Amino acid sequence: MKRTFQPSRLVRARRHGFRARTATVGGRKVLAARRARGRKKLSA
C-alpha cells in the first residue's frame, strides 16, 4: 500500500491556498477565524 501523503506544492496551493479560501463563504469564515485568533499564517 502506498503512502497517503504524496506532496505536491501546486495541489496544496489550489486546495488550501488563500485564493481557494476566499472563493467560498466557508473559506472566508476560516480566514476570519484565523485572523481573529492572530495566526501568523492564514493559509497554505
Swiss-Prot record:
Family that this chain belongs to: Belongs to the bacterial ribosomal protein bL34 family.
One GO-annotated biological process of the protein: translation
Pfam families found in the cross-reference section: Ribosomal_L34
Designated name of the protein: Large ribosomal subunit protein bL34
Keywords: Ribonucleoprotein, Ribosomal protein
Gene Ontology molecular function: any one: structural constituent of ribosome
GO cellular component, one term: ribonucleoprotein complex
Gene3D superfamilies assigned: 1.10.287.3980
Domain of life: Bacteria
Taxonomy of the source species: Bacteria, Pseudomonadati, Pseudomonadota, Alphaproteobacteria, Sphingomonadales
